[in-house]
Amino acid sequence: MDSINKDETSKTADKVGAKFQLTDAEVATAYSVVNGSYAWYVSSYTEQLFGTGNNQLLKIEQRVVSEVAGATTFNNEWNATYSNLMNLTQMIEKCSAGGIDEGKNDLLGMAQLLAAINWGVLTDLHGDIPFSECFIVGNSAPKIDSQESIYTAILKLIDDGISNLSNGGSNAGEQDIIYGGDTQKWLALGHALKARYLLHTYGRNKSVISQVESEAQAAIAGGFAGFYLDIFNGVTADNAWSAYQWSRYYIGSSKTVDDLMLERNDPREPYYNFNALGGNVIGIPGDTELASLTETVNEPIWLENGAANLAIMSESELYFILAEAQAIQGKDAKASFEAAVSSNVAEYFEICGDEISSDDVNAYLSDIEPLFEANPLKEIRIQKYLAQTRGEMIETYNDMRRIMYTDGNYPVTMQNPNNNGGTGNRWPYRLPYGDSDVVSNPNVAAAFGSGNEAGMFIFTENVWWAGGSR
């Protein structure tokens, strides 16, 4: 009788082909993991955007400890990312030896690269996390692994992904809604990701910088033009940023960014600081009055384009990585720097519903040339900061912590006065763990702390690649 209502024609999860899980993995990575609340909140910490609307982001601007360090703040994103990783782990198992899709190396490589991105987001933001014992049946309390060991695994996932994709294949088909199953594009992505994650570890191992350069060059040679989810129409399907803004109007433009743009006569400035709501006022980081306003503060106009793509890794990020690696080694980085800026400016205008001529782009490059010539590394990093104001704040947050560790300071000074409260630093060096594991997993609960110390480690302890021990 136990099986009387069982549908014998319905396949269980372990019998579903891996390719049918790919689309969901791509959408979740772009929409929930990279461009969801993680990025929305972090954009206040990096001051690339301003939190307004008299609600959660008001508290973030004020650096209210219960919001910044609370376990409930990122619980949805924590759970969504682990859920996506469970899906990707199933794909990898199905495409590995003994799996139902054994030999489908293209699918295996795609899943491995996506898994590297998702694990990267989790450990970059949270530090030491449950990893090696996750998704094991019967283990409801996986141990916490060190970020150093997780990075070893991430880089292996990328290497394995590149190896598998090198064998070609056409098993993904239309289920791959980003690259259409093109393994050459996935291969280029693999090298781009290798450059990104190696650069994160530069503070721990200076010798990786030449490999960062070579991997970036390999990605460019492979034709890398960005990794974007471009499936939205702005009517029945909106990207994550526009959907969030239209439902709440919690995001505004930041004076920290606008001042840098004005200093450089940046053609993106009118689109970044756009008077969309009639208030014609720009957000000043930490200003409680402005953060308390509703539907008043200026916003980047791209937020009003619901059809805009979502970047998982942009073309400009890769060129900025290459330029930084070259500059660190004392090499000529001008061509890479100009390619990075040109790529982003053109993309920014397109997303904002406009276009810019090559002459105007070249004029801007001429305007900022003296800044580059005076200090190439500084201007590379500032321009990357400006370029990543459209949805790439997680990587900026990573850059800030990495560079503060290697260089002692970041070239863009944060202006929010609430970063330094009367009781010490209130700019988080990482994000708190998700509440579901703080409550149910004793290992995470112990790491999170209890009582007055619960979550407070985020203000004092860096992640491993930024010089910390957890």
Where are these regions (language model features)?
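Amphipathic alpha-helical surface "interface" segments used
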Residues: 46-49, 173-188, 235-241, 361-369, ...
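Membrane-proximal, proline-rich intrinsically disordered regions
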Residues: 1-51, 216-219, 301, 404-470
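Structured, solvent-exposed acidic/aromatic patches
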Residues: 15-19, 53-352, 371-377, 383, ...
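Conserved SxxK-family serine transpeptidase/carboxypeptidase catalytic domain
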Residues: 344, 348-399, 410-451
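Short amphipathic alpha-helical segments enriched in hydrophobics
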Residues: 29, 33, 92-95, 388
